[in-house]
């Protein structure tokens, strides 16, 4: 965030509504060039090998304006109007430039609001993905019903652009944005296919996430407004965007400006114990009361998406279940409320009573099947979880191969240390350990047993299981009982700011 300060101060002197001139500033594409597009834990971080040119960027923008949009033939899609340039490379550069420019006014607004609220010091911890789990542990054990909701995608990207126009009044900027989407993102059909939108989101992640976050922000602002008006106790917590990789937004009282127009309480939504959590395109709605009120909110969401955002959604896609009988998936974990029953013997004078006490506990466990599926997709094991070698890494040195596998294990241990049961995590580590051994044996053209016997690498590979204990020993006292207790308990880290392939809720 510090790298934006210099450029944001330059934009502060200008009117925030006029973003079009910033598209032609060279420092914008300097940031776009250095931005890292790949955040997967399975590959190395890397930048572009090509050289970019601001002059080429300006030429491409000029050619977009010179195209004749009144004549559209069937062969237009096969023609490349940018001959001599790497179209895919420059589309990502321009897309990144659009995202950086449009983030500027909102980032300035966020910075000023954080300074006024005096929460700058705690802002980093609030941005952590793991910050949601203490909230779940504190609140969800007292709730009875949960609704697992998938936020539908807009049928056309034009809907996302129109939502952004309510906030930024710059006609030339949006005209250029539409031209870019038309040329680079196959926007020449009335209803884009789901595959084309998925391709655009993967090739232009920053711009797509910004537009999508704005769509979710609009829907959540209306939801929080009705929630605040539905009960006399106002919400004091934040409405949060947990995927703050590219778009930073954490606002308090999003709909405070509408309070003057609606001075009465909506009685049909009255529910003081309703809780809402969202990550990416998935949200969890939980309540303590009967499912009748949950059904009210369910149909409210459906009508809101269909009537206000022109997004089709069906009631059968939103299920309402009991927390004690249903597990929900969020942030790469499976969570459910477990009932612990205990019997207490009580004696009063000559009478003895047996009292059964039922307590609730939120179980957060590692989803072993999705993790194995992710490892199989990355070619570390097969679909059954049997480890296989990684031949594409065989050209590296032994140290680099081991370091790559250890880096993946560190990321997994760091993220999944909040699990109630560590057995599944140890199984994933075991798969990676054997995959590392098989990769080294494949490189040296030997069997696994012969390689271990010859090189004595078994002690080195024990780091897969001992490294996390060494990290904990630096934080907590070196007492065996204390370390054993922390291995059994959950540990949430407040420095996890980025998501990866393993925690995407597909």
Curated annotation (Swiss-Prot):
Keywords, in A-Z order: Chloroplast, mRNA processing, Plastid, RNA-binding, tRNA processing
Subcellular location: Plastid, Chloroplast
InterPro entries: Domain_X, Maturase_MatK, Maturase_MatK_N
Membrane-crossing residue ranges in chain numbering: none
One Gene Ontology term, aspect cellular component: chloroplast
Superkingdom of the organism of origin: Eukaryota
Primary localisation category: plastid
Pfam families: Intron_maturas2 (PF01348), MatK_N (PF01824)
A GO term for molecular function: RNA binding
GO biological-process terms attached to the record: mRNA processing; RNA splicing; tRNA processing
Similarity remark: Belongs to the intron maturase 2 family. MatK subfamily.
Role summary: Usually encoded in the trnK tRNA gene intron. Probably assists in splicing its own and other chloroplast group II introns.
PANTHER family registered for this protein in UniProt: MATURASE K
Protein known as: Maturase K
Organism: Trifolium gracilentum (Pinpoint clover)
């Amino acid at each position: 965030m510090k790298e934006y300060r210099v450029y944001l101060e330059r934009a502060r002197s200008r009117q925030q509504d006029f973003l079009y001139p910033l598209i032609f500033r060279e420092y914008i594409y300097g940031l776009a060039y250095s931005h890292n597009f790949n955040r997967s834990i399975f590959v190395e971080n890397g930048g572009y090998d090509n050289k970019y040119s601001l002059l080429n960027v300006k030429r491409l923008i000029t050619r977009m304006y010179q195209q004749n949009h009144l004549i559209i033939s069937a062969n237009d899609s096969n023609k490349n109007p940018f001959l001599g340039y790497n179209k895919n490379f420059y589309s990502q550069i321009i897309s990144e430039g659009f995202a950086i420019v449009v983030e500027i006014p909102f980032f300035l607004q966020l910075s000023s609001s954080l300074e006024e609220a005096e929460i700058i010091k705690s802002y980093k911890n609030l941005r952590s993905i793991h910050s949601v789990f203490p909230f779940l542990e504190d609140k969800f054990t007292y709730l009875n019903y949960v609704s697992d909701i998938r936020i539908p995608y807009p049928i056309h990207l034009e809907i996302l652009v129109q939502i952004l126009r309510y906030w930024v009044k710059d006609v030339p900027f949006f005209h250029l944005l539409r031209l870019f989407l038309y040329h680079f993102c196959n926007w020449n059909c009335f209803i884009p296919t789901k595959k084309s939108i998925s391709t655009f989101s993967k090739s232009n992640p920053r711009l797509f996430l910004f537009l999508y976050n704005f769509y979710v922000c609009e829907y959540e602002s209306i939801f929080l407004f009705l929630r605040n008006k539905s009960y006399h106790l106002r919400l004091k917590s934040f409405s949060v965007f947990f995927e703050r990789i590219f778009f930073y937004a954490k606002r308090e009282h999003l709909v405070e400006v509408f309070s003057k127009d609606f001075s009465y309480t909506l009685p049909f939504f009255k529910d003081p114990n309703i809780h809402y959590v969202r990550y990416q395109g998935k949200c969890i709605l939980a309540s303590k009361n009967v499912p009748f009120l949950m059904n009210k909110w369910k149909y409210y969401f459906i009508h809101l998406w269909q009537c206000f955002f022109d997004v089709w959604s069906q009631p059968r896609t939103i299920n309402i279940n009991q927390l004690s009988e249903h597990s929900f998936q969020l942030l790469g974990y499976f969570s459910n409320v477990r009932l612990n029953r205990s019997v207490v013997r009580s004696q009063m004078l000559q009478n003895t009573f047996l009292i059964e006490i039922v307590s609730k506990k939120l179980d957060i466990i590692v989803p072993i099947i999705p993790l194995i599926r992710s490892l199989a997709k990355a070619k570390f094991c097969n679909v059954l979880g049997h480890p296989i070698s990684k031949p594409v890494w065989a050209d590296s040195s032994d140290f680099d191969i081991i370091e790559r596998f250890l880096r993946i294990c560190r990321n997994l241990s760091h993220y999944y240390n909040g699990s109630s049961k560590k057995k599944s995590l140890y199984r994933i580590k075991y798969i990676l350990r054997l995959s590392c051994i098989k990769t080294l044996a494949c490189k040296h053209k030997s069997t696994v047993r012969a390689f271990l016997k010859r090189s004595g690498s078994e002690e080195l590979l024990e780091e897969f299981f001992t490294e996390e204990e060494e990290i904990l020993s630096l934080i907590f006292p070196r007492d065996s009982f204390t370390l054993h207790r922390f291995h059994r308990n959950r540990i949430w880290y407040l420095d996890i700011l980025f998501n990866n392939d393993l925690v995407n809720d597909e």
